[in-house]
A protein has these predicted regions:
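Glycine-rich FAD pyrophosphate-binding loop
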Residues: 19-41
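N-terminal Rossmann-fold NAD(P) dinucleotide-binding loop
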Residues: 14-15
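Dinucleotide-binding Rossmann-like beta1-alpha1 core, especially the glycine-rich loop
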Residues: 52, 79-100
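Beta1/beta-strand and adjacent pyrophosphate-binding region of the FAD-binding site
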Residues: 1-11
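FAD/FMN-dependent oxidoreductases across multiple families
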Residues: 122, 222, 228-307, 313
Length: 421
């Protein structure tokens, strides 16, 4: 079968690419190995800017059961914790089973052909197009292919756009998504535990409308080297910690636990070549600080669809023409994602740094606000750094001076006067 555009992967990146091609008159199809709705292991948190960025899909997004979270508790390796809050919601919590299905159904309703239970096992780029072969030996042909097939992207690997992930580029995450009748939590608060179980581990609890996602993850390099327990045993230990601190009650449901990997090493150097575009996890678009990937999948998928439409209409599927996809993604999300990797490395390299950040944020409302706004994508990394210096440094220096002065007073045994008094 011959298509103008084939999209491999029916998740948020693939669906957003297809939405840009709806009504174009082009022959477009989505190929996905699963049958929807399908279980998709994922934390399921989306920064609320997604609803502003994709306002045209409001009716689709609002059809998905969603829990809006207004508080975030961030715990450091030492057990110190700070609470972030905002007037509006910080994150929208969804189930990928429902969210992805809603987007894909929107594509179907818009005339996009969707082929489920099709696993692409081979891909060949030629002068006349791209040949894809399924595991059932079914063949598909297209002028252009969008690889939105996730962290283990067949499209990215078989076109030479990346080799195997290095162990320091991916994380292994074990997550449980169970009904809140089994795992009872406060629905208005999400929890994040940086440095859990070691310098390169993290834990999280995300309450959904009727479910909760709770899990532990590690950089794969650290997990293979330093973690001896199996993922589910680690998971149960984390649940015990949450129960001890009265964050959660109830019992784990083993059948709802899944381990998966996600890219946390930053975007690929190139996300296009002759006749090929990449989007979402396949392109490495995951925030290294928050581990959020859905928003970036949607943005990059939209850009991929727009570029594909222009390429087919201009009869130009060369690497040079398709590079506009790289530029569009770089402008909107690429720089942000690379800076998130910088922050990730600084925090995970030394648990004491995380402890210091949490202690400082506990006593400084401005720092709490800035960190929360950065976490939900309202301000850039550069703005965060600048405003942390200009708006919080004076208070921090005063705090340190007062602490030294109090120590000097106790040591001397006399009531020393402050300078200028």
């Amino acid at each position: 079968m011959k298509y103008d555009v084939l999209i491999v992967g029916g998740g948020p990146a693939g669906s957003m690419a297809a939405i840009q091609l709806m009504g174009s008159g082009l022959r477009v199809a989505i190929l996905d190995r699963a049958q929807f709705p399908r279980i998709k292991p994922c934390g399921g948190g989306i920064s609320c800017r997604a609803y502003r960025r994709f306002a045209k899909l409001e009716h689709v997004l609002k059809s998905v059961p969603t829990n809006l979270v207004h508080k975030l508790v961030f715990e450091s390796p030492s057990g110190d914790a700070v609470e972030f809050s905002a007037d509006g919601p910080l994150y929208a919590m969804i189930r990928r089973l429902e969210f992805d299905n809603a987007l894909l159904n929107h594509c179907k309703a818009g005339g996009i052909e969707v082929r489920e239970d099709v696993t692409v096992s081979r891909l060949e780029v030629g002068v006349d197009g791209v040949r894809l072969t399924s595991s059932a030996d079914e063949e598909f042909f297209a002028d252009l292919v969008i690889g939105a097939d996730g962290v283990n992207s067949t499209v990215a690997v078989q076109t030479g756009m990346r080799g195997p992930w290095r162990h320091n580029q991916i994380a292994i995450d074990g997550t449980e998504e169970s009904p809140r009748t089994s795992l009872n939590v406060n629905p208005d608060t999400m929890y994040v535990y940086y440095g859990y179980g070691g310098g390169y581990g993290y834990g999280y609890l995300f309450p959904k409308a009727s479910h909760v996602n709770v899990g532990v993850g590690y950089f794969l390099e650290y997990f293979k080297r330093d973690v001896s327990q199996k993922p589910y045993v680690q998971h149960l230990d984390f649940l015990d910690h949450l129960k001890t601190t009265s964050v959660l009650s109830g019992q784990s449901q083993r059948e709802n636990f899944h381990a998966y990997v996600l890219p946390v090493g930053g975007p690929l150097e190139r996300i296009s070549r002759d006749r090929i575009l990449l989007a979402g996890d396949a392109a490495g678009f995951v925030n290294g600080f928050t581990a959020e990937g859905i928003y970036y999948a949607m943005v990059s998928g939209e850009h991929a669809g727009h570029t594909a439409l222009n390429a087919i209409r201009n009869r130009n599927t060369t690497a040079e023409f398709l590079r506009r996809h790289d530029r569009a993604c770089e402008t909107e999300i690429g720089h942000e994602l690379r800076k998130s990797i910088t922050l990730q490395k600084r925090l995970f390299a030394n648990p004491a740094v995380i402890d210091s950040v949490v202690r400082f944020a506990k006593r400084n409302a401005t720092a709490r606000s800035l960190l929360a706004r950065y976490g939900v994508g309202e301000i850039s990394y550069e703005e965060l750094k600048w405003r942390m210096v200009t708006e919080t440094l004076p208070g921090y220096l005063r705090y340190q001076f007062d602490k030294v002065w109090r120590k000097a007073t106790r040591f001397s045994g006399t009531a020393l006067q402050m300078p200028g008094s």
